[in-house]
Amino acid sequence: MSINWVTYKEGSESDILLLENECMFDCFDGVAISILCKPPSLKSWTCTKGLLCLTNQRLVYIAKDTDCDFKDFQSPVANLKDTKLNQPFFGANYYSGTVMPVPNGGIPCEAEVKLQFNEGGIFNFVEAWNRLIQRFQEVDSVSRVQHLDPLPPYHRPSSSQDQPPHYEEAVNKS
């Protein structure tokens, strides 16, 4: 995760430049974010209004409120752990989780992230997020499969001596 490291397309303050092999899944406007580092750091960042973008590689938040402590936030999808949907009795629904730091990202230690969807859209976000996590898990499980030696190639018997017993009878019956 990193603070103020998002690269924008030229002439735009909200259109992010996608990484290689990255595609945009969805964007959600009117999202508030709070990032609270766990002890011993206790640093925190908050913003009451911004744009949240979900790609196949990362979660990107762009602050739209000028009073925010930061301009943008991004985290690789694989660095978000223990995520969950929270539905309080009073207040807007929010999504929370633990974010692991990246080297030189501006955030010193793992942090608790809270995304509050003030203008709706949380269920669309959760659906897209769950599909993305499922893809990550499928790729991870495929990479862990033990690859055995390949089967030898099949060669059709060239003579009747190479054929199994009663082969001719079985072929002629059909």
Swiss-Prot record:
The keyword Phosphoprotein does not apply. It is found in: Cytoplasm; Nucleus. The keyword Cytoplasm applies. One of its GO terms (molecular function) is chromatin DNA binding. Keywords: Cytoplasm, Nucleus. GO terms for cellular component: cytosol; nucleus. GO terms for biological process: positive regulation of DNA-templated transcription; positive regulation of transcription by RNA polymerase II. Residues 165-174 have a biased composition (Basic and acidic residues). It comes from the Eukaryota. Residues 147-174 are annotated as: Disordered. Induction: By stress. Belongs to the UPF0664 family. This is UPF0664 stress-induced protein C29B12.11c. The lineage of its organism: Eukaryota, Fungi, Dikarya, Ascomycota, Taphrinomycotina.
